[in-house]
Structure formats: structure tokens, C-alpha cells
Amino acid sequence: MIGAFKRQLLSNLAFIFLFSFLFAVYCQSAIFFFDNAEAVRENTAASSDFTERLILLDAGHGGEDGGTVGVNGINEKVLNLETSAALEVYLRFAGFEVVQTRTEDVLLYDKSTDFKGRKKMLDLAERLRIAEELLPDLFISIHMNSFPDGKYAGLTVYYSPNDERSRVAAELMRASVVEHLQPDNRRELKRAGSNIYLLDRLDTPSVLVECGFLSNAEECELLCTKEYRHKLSFVLFSSVSSFFEE
């Protein structure tokens, strides 16, 4: 009887602890968002045209394609999607129209076609089709980086060579990150080559953001926290709003 009571008590305590933890995480995220709400308004006060601006967010990988794997075992695809979702919150709050290429853990290929050995290519082709159909004012692809040597860290921005405004957007993103989040970041902007499928083919302003190195233990740990992803997303949002005020 006593053993059953203790098991029930421990079960109840575990539930209370879990609920308290999840509530604390929610409150922390909410506090960060509302603490920055005034900053969002200040960022958008200079322009009344944001409601006419379409941002296409592209969370890289998904489904069967997990992307790179962090030192702690996290799949890149998860962090890409969560970072894109956080960025969307700030953009929408400021009045931007936002579309995501994916909002679920999926690869974007037609499962009714002959996809064997072609899933990744079909996925990229579908993302390209979406972007060419929507013609966004800015295309932002979200990814995470990795390298065999775990000493490397820091956000990196690639820009499309097909529209000069892509480099402008990338420069603003890098500058904002250095000023507000990573003051020691010395990573240079990178012009996308043919190996970056989407940026090589898109004619609209397009950037790809490698948010950090999952091969670096410290940075991987940061990127796995909701608080840091929201800070990063806010910094990226700030640069996007500056881009449309240029």
C-alpha cells in the first residue's frame, strides 16, 4: 500500500515538475517577445509599406533529409524549421506577408512520381517552383552549418549573384548579427555558386543564412535553446526591416 502511494506521489511530482518547466519556457519566450515588441514598432515606424512586402522563408531539409547532425545528435532540419517559425512571428507582427516553403517535417516532392534516388533534387525543384511562382520581395533560406573541425563557429550569409539587392540584404544581416549577437564574428559574406541550387537560379533578392555550426559544441548548445533562436530571429528581422527602408 505504501509502495503504491509513493509511486503515485512520485508520478504526481514528476508531472508538476514537467508542467512547471514547460510553463517557464513559455513565459521566457513570451517575455522576450513582448520585451522586443516596442523595438519591432520602432523598426517598422519609418515605413508603411511592409504590408505590401512578401517574404518567403525556406526551412532547409526536412523529412527523410535531416541535414547535418549536431554534436549532441540534433538534426539540422529541426532547428531550421523552428528558427524559420520564430522569424515568421516577428515579420508578421511588423506587417510583412510571410509564406513558408514548409511548415512540417517533410521533403517537398510528389510521392506519386518516380522519386527513387531523386528526392532531394525534386525537393529543391519544388522550392524553386514556389519561389518563382510567388516572386517574393525577399527569399530567405535557413540552414545550419557544420565542419569536421569543431573550432569553427558563427553565422554565415550567402547571397544570390542574380540580383544586386541580394548582397545588400546579406550585408545588412551580417552587420546586424555582429552588432547585436556575435561581436567576434569575422566570417565574410559569400557569393553563392552553382552548388547552392536555389540562390544560383533565383532572380529575386535571395539569401541563405547558415545560422551557426552544429559541429561546435558551444554554438550547437545555443542553437538548441528557444531563447537564442528568438534572439537570432529578431536580429534577422531587424535587418530585413532595414533592407526595405533603404
Locate predicted features.
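Catalytic-site microenvironment of enzymes
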Residues: 1-246
